[in-house]
Amino acid sequence: MATRKDTEEEQVVPSEEDEANVRAVQAHYLRSPSPSQYSMVSDAETESIFMEPIHLSSAIAAKQIINEELKPPGVRADAECPGMLESAEQLLVEDLYNRVREKMDDTSLYNTPCVLDLQRALVQDRQEAPWNEVDEVWPNVFIAEKSVAVNKGRLKRLGITHILNAAHGTGVYTGPEFYTGLEIQYLGVEVDDFPEVDISQHFRKASEFLDEALLTYRGKVLVSSEMGISRSAVLVVAYLMIFHNMAILEALMTVRKKRAIYPNEGFLKQLRELNEKLMEEREEDYGREGGSAEAEEGEGTGSMLGARVHALTVEEEDDSASHLSGSSLGKATQASKPLTLIDEEEEEKLYEQWKKGQGLLSDKVPQDGGGWRSASSGQGGEELEDEDVERIIQEWQSRNERYQAEGYRRWGREEEKEEESDAGSSVGRRRRTLSESSAWESVSSHDIWVLKQQLELNRPDHGRRRRADSMSSESTWDAWNERLLEIEKEASRRYHAKSKREEAADRSSEAGSRVREDDEDSVGSEASSFYNFCSRNKDKLTALERWKIKRIQFGFHKKDLGAGDSSGEPGAEEAVGEKNPSDVSLTAYQAWKLKHQKKVGSENKEEVVELSKGEDSALAKKRQRRLELLERSRQTLEESQSMASWEADSSTASGSIPLSAFWSADPSVSADGDTTSVLSTQSHRSHLSQAASNIAGCSTSNPTTPLPNLPVGPGDTISIASIQNWIANVVSETLAQKQNEMLLLSRSPSVASMKAVPAASCLGDDQVSMLSGHSSSSLGGCLLPQSQARPSSDMQSVLSCNTTLSSPAESCRSKVRGTSKPIFSLFADNVDLKELGRKEKEMQMELREKMSEYKMEKLASDNKRSSLFKKKKVKEDEDDGVGDGDEDTDSAIGSFRYSSRSNSQKPETDTCSSLAVCDHYASGSRVGKEMDSSINKWLSGLRTEEKPPFQSDWSGSSRGKYTRSSLLRETESKSSSYKFSKSQSEEQDTSSYHEANGNSVRSTSRFSSSSTREGREMHKFSRSTYNETSSSREESPEPYFFRRTPESSEREESPEPQRPNWARSRDWEDVEESSKSDFSEFGAKRKFTQSFMRSEEEGEKERTENREEGRFASGRRSQYRRSTDREEEEEMDDEAIIAAWRRRQEETRTKLQKRRED
């Protein structure tokens, strides 16, 4: 093995050359990239000893291995020459170059963008991180980061049913067992987020998982990864590309719109490859579909026929277009680009082959149109061996079955007639005539005449054009597409010529002149003339006229033509009646069919009738939907004006509505809508007033309001255009009227009150707005059952509860008088101002009575419960009479009890702003005398009352936000609900008894001998009423609008100078604290009841402040006495108050429950 020389040199330290060789051997045997400088055995500076695995102990052994393994050592030395090595910079630059070249590589058969372009599209102007942890990037597909995937509660809230973990075991460490109990299906894909990782192997599996989750389970899928920007995004994009046929850029941008994704470049490269593969597969599929038939328009665009039929189908499905609309658009796009289906040479070759094979069996072909029918309709079933042709035929059959089913033989006979009548003309000329008209025909009609053309070309020489079913259908389809190609070229050529010469060329041809004539005569004949008409008059047509044109397209104007009568149709631009081609029931397509037959010289109405059968089934859904809409609107009109009994046919057949539809009648609709809409407000008013009078047993018929002069069409109908203009005028006038009324409301309640009665008939809706003052709830409470009373929104006080139970007769009477005649019917052009004035006076008298009583009660109850007025009343102590005080308290307590017992409507009367309330007082010092005083006196009192309302230091609801005009407005509107609570006037008697829950309290000389029991009673009453109103609020569907306005806002917004705030008494604070603690058990009701108390107290203070201005001295003395009574009651134990209040609350609850059951 070793020579002598080798043995001698054994002890020599290896030379440089040997070192190089040793390194090479090490690299070869050990694959050790950088051997240690020191030997592991002896720490000697010898590299050979390091190679323990092959036990080389000397440089000789290394040399021998080098000699054996690497024959020319010189070459190795040269390769290691430093001059030959690339520097690190060069290597980096080269690597960068290679990477950029890969990223910019856009070599693709299908124009797939390069990776760099994809990255630019994703980054756009800046790179973003996702805003949210989870985003829904496709319906029911969520991309999320790790934190969402491990948050089971959030998954449950999102409704996730499937989880695709793109970082299974590589970042998101969950698994099927992690989601046990959540009914979540899990698929984990173990992929690292590195460019060199192959994620494409998981594309198909992940996409199928997503597809199954979405389609089979109708679930929601969460695709999770570490950050939700790379791996998960790539899997979702692959799903969109595979199952939704998206191109790579479209799929990426679809996801990017919803979430900032940034797949790494390796993944983008794999998506590119997937895109190429999918495009190739689809091209092969399309090639199989149309390759045999040679009917391809280009790469994967489908057959010409398929495109046309698709266009037809899309148009049919489009709601805003008819089944004929848009046909000219389709024509333009198809004809503007001459379509090259196959090369001419290729076509010639195929044609020759076809002729050879076809000659054998030509004698077996039937001699009428049935042969072509069997060729087309029988082909799919009989020639299953040829899948490609079968596919095309099935597509054709499924989409055109309604045309093929009945008509081919008739078409054949028709074509024969055409040939006889047109014997002198050549086939080419015939074809040119057809293609002339093709630029103007609809998509569906185009399909028909293509078939006819094929028939016609088949007929002259059956030996050349026919073949039996057993023949190769491929060649027949080639021939057919060849003819189709010729037709299309001619059509496009003709189309371009026409577009240049406009209609000048049309005049030269029969078809062109006919088309122009039709276009002038009627908008309803052909879809393409519709298109031209609309494009020419696009700027002139209103929305209504466009709708009418659409209606003609839909064929509704011809609905009743089967009987032979034609209803006049006022045109959009030209009011020319629609021509009736025949007495047959026609649709737009059938109209075209007849015209087309006239063009080519024959007319076959039976065929058109046959076509109608198929077409009706095709358009059934759409027509059914329209008819249902029309029927529904007709029923709505009939219900709201039941006098009108006009037929649906006349309304649907013509674009007009009978005059009788607009006369208000005896309506029966229940108004639960938003009465802010002008027309609905008026109609609700009229028919609800009718309902109210019926309930009262005094039903009267609503007087009909005369219509303005409208242009009347045939059959006593009105043109819809004129109706539209007229309605616009009425609406604008009504709006102006409403604005004027609102201005009146802000000026004086007596003027404003004319709105209270009609509006009152609307059942407790959230009428117009709180400021506008239509307190329509006032009568609503009478109309509704007790348990359903709807409290109209606003910050009413406790006492606003009507005592309708105690005064049914009065409420009925006021109902009848208030609403038996509607002041405004649906389209009121004239208003009886005298009647309004009379009603206003009656109402105002009632309101003044009720409000004076109410005001007294409120003040009494308020001052009984609060010592806030103590300081103000000291000065004018002497002026007040005891009688008034007793009367106040009496009425107040009675009203409390009545209101808490009768869970009738909580009306919208707020505490009736201080201005109006004090005006009621101003007209007389005695409440009893108020009943007779007139509106003029009331108004004069209003004018003299200019003192600002009193502002408290705890202003309650939105009172502080209103200016004087809105206070007046609110007063008027809300006090109207006291119309029927007349029974309170009996409570003026200072010795009257009032009953609540079988509890009789004698409140005669209350203030001379007030005791702690009475104080407790008052607390009990006030609190229980708050509770009662809040609990009744539960059952009412109407929202309550309670606001707590801070005192500062009231001071800022009130236009009048402020009075100094009165100090808050300890007694009131006690009451408030106890009410807070008691109401806390009511949860959300607590703040409502408290603000309820506050608004009430605030209204009372305003009223009291106004009264204090020198008007009601006697009342003031009693108030002062009441305040001193309150001071006595301050010593009362809070526990007693709470106990009494709770007892009262329980009683109220039981009563409410009973009332609900009743």
From Swiss-Prot:
Pfam families reported in the protein's UniProt record: DSPc
Major subcellular location class: cytoplasm
SUPFAM superfamilies: (Phosphotyrosine protein) phosphatases II (SSF52799)
Keyword vocabulary terms for this entry: Cytoplasm, Phosphoprotein
Modified residues (Phosphoserine): 377, 509, 985, 1036
Transmembrane segments: none
Record family assignment: Belongs to the protein-tyrosine phosphatase family. Non-receptor class dual specificity subfamily.
Stated name of the protein: Serine/threonine/tyrosine-interacting-like protein 2
Taxonomic source organism: Homo sapiens
